[in-house]
Design a protein with these regions (language model features):
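Generic signature of intrinsically disordered, low-complexity, basic-rich segments
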Residues: 9-10, 24, 46, 132, ...
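Conserved helix-loop-beta core of C-type lectin(-like) domains
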Residues: 28-35, 40-62
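Catalytic and binding regions of secreted/periplasmic enzymes and modules that target cell-wall glycans
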Residues: 49-147
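Surface-exposed patches in mature extracellular/periplasmic domains of secreted proteins
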Residues: 21-31, 42-47, 104-116
Length: 147
């Protein structure tokens, strides 16, 4: 099976989270979680771990409870391998379910590197949305032809 994954930048991760409805207040925590769990690697798969489980994708979603290997299932009703590609919208949906059920404390990487460690939280306030970037490029394009 060929997996198409990528290493996200902090700003790419922040944009994906924002586009998926994550509150701006928590985006730094989510990006820190993603960095601590997977290094922002969307195709990372680790295992076997406890109960022969594997962890998938940028959030390291575990096959023991949240998804099933080779078929849809688990609490997120998802195929684990789908969390190991460059489309993280499904990963975010499942991670939101995990967070709403168990909190950020579910992820040991977040507990060790992000919790009570405000200095470790990435500053993503300077990240521009794609719409803002497109607008800036369009303005430069118009200015080029205005002279």
């Amino acid at each position: 099976m060929e997996v198409n994954g990528k290493i996200l930048s902090e700003c790419e991760a922040a944009r994906e989270l924002k586009n998926s409805g994550i509150s701006a207040t928590f985006i730094s925590n989510w990006v820190c979680l993603m960095k601590s769990e997977s290094g922002l690697n969307t195709s990372l798969v680790k295992g076997p771990g406890t109960m022969s489980s594997y962890s998938y994708g940028v959030f390291q979603i575990n096959s023991y409870k949240w998804c099933k290997r080779g078929r849809k299932g688990g609490e997120c009703n998802a195929k684990c391998e789908d969390f190991a590609d460059d489309d993280i919208t499904d990963d975010i949906a499942c991670a939101k379910k995990i967070q709403s059920t168990e909190g950020f404390k579910h992820w040991t990487g977040w507990l060790k590197k992000c919790y009570k460690n405000e200095g470790a939280l990435p500053d993503v306030s300077g990240c521009k949305s794609n719409a803002v970037k497109r607008h800036a490029l369009f303005k430069r394009f118009l200015n080029f032809f205005a002279y």
